Amino acid sequence: MKGILGRKVEMTQVFTSAGQLVPVTVVEVLPNTVLQVKTIDSDGYVAVQLGTTDKRVNLVNKPELGHFKKANSNPKRFVKEIRNMQGYELGQVINVSDIFVSGEYVDVTGISKGKGFAGGIKRHNYARGPMAHGSGYHRGIGSMGAIINRIFKSKKMPGHMGNAKRTIQNLEIIAIDQPNNIMLIKGSIPGSKNSFVQIKQNIKGMSSKQAVELLNRNASIEA
């Protein structure tokens, strides 16, 4: 397993050399620092804890500051561990080009946009009731099941929509711009602008393919 932490910037589009338009999400992947290395002997499982994006020292309590100092690192805003990732040393700095290449498929995990309290129609795509004047309901969820003294768990009902951890699988890496710490991922990913995401090696099916050749607009203008 391999992975890295990044920050969602925005969505845009690029063109391939064949003229095909590709929608992409721009992800800023600043250098990640290895803050902790977990092993089976010491922790019972294998994992690497990564951190990215510096934050001010006065925003960190003493236990956290001591944890960062063990890795000889500045305090980090976003810290996550990636299981089954090994082969890295405490304090090592990882760049996006050290982990991934264009054409690979990845799974992206983030916190989805919060929508507040939502009804069954918006939250679960329920059908709307009759809108005629004499109908008994319009946007209600209707029956909640059989006659029983409780509501079953996972029953789809109105409630807080969004603001939950979500993963989108098998997204293609279109391009990596290492000098600018930028990665272009095909399609959309969870979260709002400037939210942090985890980018990990995909775990299902899709294998890497040849990288897409993008259109060089500067060359077109000069011609």
Curated annotation (Swiss-Prot):
Domain of life assignment: Bacteria
Protein name from the UniProt record: Large ribosomal subunit protein uL3
Task performed by this protein: One of the primary rRNA binding proteins, it binds directly near the 3'-end of the 23S rRNA, where it nucleates assembly of the 50S subunit.
Annotated GO MF terms: rRNA binding; structural constituent of ribosome
Family indicated by similarity: Belongs to the universal ribosomal protein uL3 family.
GO annotation, cellular component aspect: cytosolic large ribosomal subunit
NCBIfam families for this protein: L3_bact
GO annotation, biological process: translation
PROSITE patterns (UniProt xref): RIBOSOMAL_L3 (PS00474)
Gene: rplC
